Amino acid sequence: MASKKREVQLQTVINNQSLWDEMLQNKGLTVIDVYQAWCGPCRAMQPLFRKLKNELNEDEILHFAVAEADNIVTLQPFRDKCEPVFLFSVNGKIIEKIQGANAPLVNKKVINLIDEERKIAAGEMARPQYPEIPLVDSDSEVSEESPCESVQELYSIAIIKPDAVISKKVLEIKRKITKAGFIIEAEHKTVLTEEQVVNFYSRIADQCDFEEFVSFMTSGLSYILVVSQGSKHNPPSEETEPQTDTEPNERSEDQPEVEAQVTPGMMKNKQDSLQEYLERQHLAQLCDIEEDAANVAKFMDAFFPDFKKMKSMKLEKTLALLRPNLFHERKDDVLRIIKDEDFKILEQRQVVLSEKEAQALCKEYENEDYFNKLIENMTSGPSLALVLLRDNGLQYWKQLLGPRTVEEAIEYFPESLCAQFAMDSLPVNQLYGSDSLETAEREIQHFFPLQSTLGLIKPHATSEQREQILKIVKEAGFDLTQVKKMFLTPEQIEKIYPKVTGKDFYKDLLEMLSVGPSMVMILTKWNAVAEWRRLMGPTDPEEAKLLSPDSIRAQFGISKLKNIVHGASNAYEAKEVVNRLFEDPEEN
């Protein structure tokens, strides 16, 4: 991997308009890598540029530069774009643009333009009159609106209450919001604490039933939504017919959002307000709307502290796979690079591929002579499958991988993972990555199918301990599909603890679980039953402190009976208990 020093020597750094204007004074050809501050220049192309610089040996007429679109007015159309863009400037005029890290095309273009410059200098040809191309990103060319419309975006907060979550109204409410022309900018699923409810609803604290309201709002999951009116908001219609599953205005839950610029003008006209629309749809009792600037800021600080910082980010999941030979010989080297490149490994597992699975992952090679050998190799032993998460993760992983064959990688992308981890056993890339977000979703679901299990926080847990446990659960990658506080009946306890009903301590267990409400949860992720049991730790807190000191029982357990949490023993038991405690348990 090239050092920063070498990169600067090879490419002039342009990070403001003044340096851009200065670059346009260059004589001859300047190849400009236009990049975003959050992802940096396209490192995969730097070996090609170094090769061209050395082989052409034309320092007077061949220059390379990297330009940060964020801080250069001229490059405004390329801001917040994921794909690399390369501009070709000849004597200060931008005459060509190539999108994507297309090494062969860039290589050919540079060689042809330098050949022209040599002939012009030798008097063998007149300078061609190339038209200067407009600096408009292809994604913007079909848009009728300016990408920099100065429209003050307005934000409000929608709080979908626990009873709406339990009754599975969340999806309906979100669809209504987006159907009305509003945009759901961010979403956070949480169990509100008493302190948060008292703080956020201080305006009604003097009402006689406020204590009961606080108890209700802390009894289960709430959804906190950041909603913007958008630059084009059509007044909501009265129609209430159901909408399709497509929600174009709603962002993915994996994508973090941004802190709002709260202004006194945040209150919308009443006829355009989200509050009035939800009232007309008979949903206002299930969803509170907050538009007061100060209160919106409170919610932002509490639930979306990185909202502004993450505004331009695009978190994506992708499937990565190390083929058997690479997994066996250099797994640790690959994992180190993955972490160094700021990927988060959400899940990983060893898997021996079936012939059908191998053929699906190697479809791009099916017409090659070595296809059968490749399938044989792919099914010969365990591969390592990973779910990776990163800003622009899918494209960034594909860029790191490089070409599909070792031959092309070594010639054009010697620093790609394909070239770095080439092996004699196969002429193809030893690593795999999904080719689209749709494919990634399908492949992740195949190799890491979701599973749900029962989680229970016992009555003796304090509110602070419950809050800490929920935080640990989320950080472990579990989705809180459903949560509710409930007083368990003896019949329900018997279902939750089917293996201990005849034990001597069962009476003590019944008594302990009857002293107050338990927090009952449906926890969802891949391999959820085993992962939740691992996170809980051994039944005895003293044993847990020795064997699993970071486990929940080691941190919060008091005794075998009061060991703070419980979980199902197996998938069958989990399904039985969840069905008994939650009617028609499914995610909102």
Curated annotation (Swiss-Prot):
Classification via Pfam families: NDK, Thioredoxin
Major subcellular location class: cytoplasm
GO biological process: cell differentiation; cellular response to reactive oxygen species; cilium assembly; flagellated sperm motility; spermatogenesis
Stretches for region NDK 2: 315-455
Statement: the UniProt record of this protein carries the keyword Repeat: yes
Associated disorder: Ciliary dyskinesia, primary, 6: A disorder characterized by abnormalities of motile cilia. Respiratory infections leading to chronic inflammation and bronchiectasis are recurrent, due to defects in the respiratory cilia; reduced fertility is often observed in male patients due to abnormalities of sperm tails. Half of the patients exhibit randomization of left-right body asymmetry and situs inversus, due to dysfunction of monocilia at the embryonic node. Primary ciliary dyskinesia associated with situs inversus is referred to as Kartagener syndrome.
Quaternary assembly: Monomer.
Entry note about domains: Contains 3 inactive NDK domains that do not possess all residues considered to be crucial for the NDPK activity.
Family indicated by similarity: In the C-terminal section; belongs to the NDK family.
Protein's UniProt name: Thioredoxin domain-containing protein 3
Species this protein is from: Homo sapiens (Human)
